[in-house]
Amino acid sequence: SHKVWHETSPAVGKAKFPLVGDPTHKLTRAFDVHIDEEGLALRGTFVINPDGVIKTLEIHSNEIARDVSETLRKLKAAQFTAANPGQVCPAKWKEGAKTLAPSIDLVGKI
């Protein structure tokens, strides 16, 4: 299914990161998204940095599709904040847009 998704989706086709399948269900059980009764997993997207730290995760029931452009936006935000410590990407942030420096002065203003 990931192979077909990669071949048919213009956004996914450009992805330069792995789309992981899990035929043994080892990963889906480890991430607690496996549905034992059905023998399948919820739709899960996990962005994990090179140190093994989960930077973003999104889990949907199988009736709800994922938005690849939003996943890519979150991936770019994770990459940006890793390269720019002390900066925060606000909601709907796009690559090249302004970021924030966390401060008590921001509370209630964004």
What is each residue range found by the language model?
Residues S1-I110:
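Chalcogenol-based redox active-site neighborhoods
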